[in-house]
Curated annotation (Swiss-Prot):
Compartments where located: Cytoplasm
Catalytic activity as recorded in UniProt: guanosine(527) in 16S rRNA + S-adenosyl-L-methionine = N(7)-methylguanosine(527) in 16S rRNA + S-adenosyl-L-homocysteine
Name of this chain's protein: Ribosomal RNA small subunit methyltransferase G
SUPFAM superfamilies: S-adenosyl-L-methionine-dependent methyltransferases
Record InterPro entries: rRNA_ssu_MeTfrase_G (IPR003682), SAM-dependent_MTases_sf (IPR029063)
GO molecular function: rRNA (guanine-N7-)-methyltransferase activity
Residues involved in S-adenosyl-L-methionine binding: G73, F78, R139
Major location category of this protein: cytoplasm
EC number(s) per entry: 2.1.1.170
Record keywords, A-Z: Cytoplasm, Methyltransferase, rRNA processing, S-adenosyl-L-methionine, Transferase
Cellular component GO terms held in the UniProt record: cytosol
Superkingdom: Bacteria
Organism (species): Coxiella burnetii (strain Dugway 5J108-111)
Similarity section: Belongs to the methyltransferase superfamily. RNA methyltransferase RsmG family.
Length: 204
């Protein structure tokens, strides 16, 4: 299975040290164990987790900008945890309103010594960290417009939203920021369509 992860990372054109890949794989095993009791993800097999969670998350790595990243609605840690593993020089904040999910994330961060992550249990609309983020990521949480409206107070001027979607979100993009760019994500081993909506924050 670790070879499947390595091949996928190579196909994405990414450079991730083998020790980090091993930690990512161990994180999936940890998630699988917790999932038996807490139902954190509908995907239960490691093989599918590699594709649907790890590689899917890592597919947006080339688009990541800045040093302060906020992952909204992190759930079981995607895309935030894989990105934090891959970018130890950046600081990630993972926010989710559900206690069982943030409890898992706190345990995972401690167990795997992911020192560049901060876990927050709170609704993102109420979150006031006292500073702006450079990039806000989000996967499977609301429409593009909803995500932008809920997090607008957290993104610095000139920063970016990276919103992960399945099929091309044509309807969602109507009436949103004209600077939106949609990238096709080719996730190794994943047959389903994946897209990334990149929107620059033009507020002055």
């Amino acid at each position: 299975m670790t070879e499947k992860l390595k091949q996928g990372i190579d196909q994405l054109g990414l450079k991730v040290p083998e020790t980090i890949q091993q930690s990512m794989f161990a994180f999936l095993a940890f998630l699988q164990k917790w999932n038996q009791a807490y139902n954190l993800t509908a995907i239960t097999e490691i093989k599918s987790m590699i594709t649907h969670h790890l590689l899917d998350s890592l597919s947006i790595l080339p688009y990541l900008k800045g040093d302060k990243i906020l992952d909204v609605g992190s759930g079981a840690g995607f895309p935030g945890i894989p990105l934090a593993f891959a970018c130890p020089e950046k600081k990630f904040t993972l926010i989710d309103s559900k206690a069982k999910k943030t409890a898992f994330l706190l345990q995972a961060a401690s167990r795997f010594k992911i020192t560049n992550v901060t876990i927050i249990q709170e609704r993102v609309g109420s979150y006031q960290p006292g500073f702006y983020f450079d990039t806000i990521t989000c996967r499977a949480l609301g429409s593009v417009r909803e995500i932008m409206e809920q997090t607008n107070h957290l993104l610095r001027p000139g920063g970016q939203w990276l919103i992960m979607k399945g099929t091309y979100p044509e309807k969602e993009l109507r009436g949103t920021d004209a600077s939106a760019i949609v990238h096709v994500l080719n996730v190794p081993g994943l047959k389903a369509e994946r897209h990334l909506v990149e929107v620059k924050n033009n507020k002055g």
